[in-house]
Curated annotation (Swiss-Prot):
EC number: 7.1.1.-
Gene (UniProt): ndhM
Localization per record: Cellular thylakoid membrane
Reactions performed catalytically: a plastoquinone + NADH + (n+1) H(+)(in) = a plastoquinol + NAD(+) + n H(+)(out); a plastoquinone + NADPH + (n+1) H(+)(in) = a plastoquinol + NADP(+) + n H(+)(out)
Protein name: NAD(P)H-quinone oxidoreductase subunit M
Length: 114
């Protein structure tokens, strides 16, 4: 049975992707980060999210994969994305089709004047 956790910027499925289709799996989790491209990501920022995902999944190692546990992982990962945004590691994509500042208003960092 396909379980999923979806937040604004994090989608997790108990499935594998084959030919752009989700195939339910009891042993594989698939992570989709920011499917609507609301944020601007560097490769480093994405790798941080993947590493945090691996860390969170490891904390549930040995436990049953339940809807509740999957939602906890998704929620914790969404909070992690918010922390990356607040630190300026990722930013809002102002060219996105949707402008939803669900994690706070964009910040403009003033450059130092000489």
């Amino acid at each position: 049975m396909l379980l999923k956790s979806t937040t604004r910027h994090i989608h997790i499925y108990t499935a594998e992707v084959e030919n752009n289709e989700l195939i339910p799996s009891e042993s594989v989790l698939t992570l989709d980060v920011d499917p609507d491209n609301e944020l601007v990501w560097s490769e480093d920022a994405l790798q941080r999210v993947y590493a945090k995902f691996d860390e969170l999944v490891e904390t549930y190692s040995g436990e049953d994969l339940t809807d509740y546990n999957l939602r906890r992982i998704g929620s914790d990962l969404e909070h992690y994305v918010r922390s990356l945004l607040q630190k300026g590691i990722v930013g809002y994509n102002l060219s996105s089709r949707v402008r939803n500042f669900s994690m706070g208003l964009p910040q403009v960092i003033a450059s130092e004047s000489k």
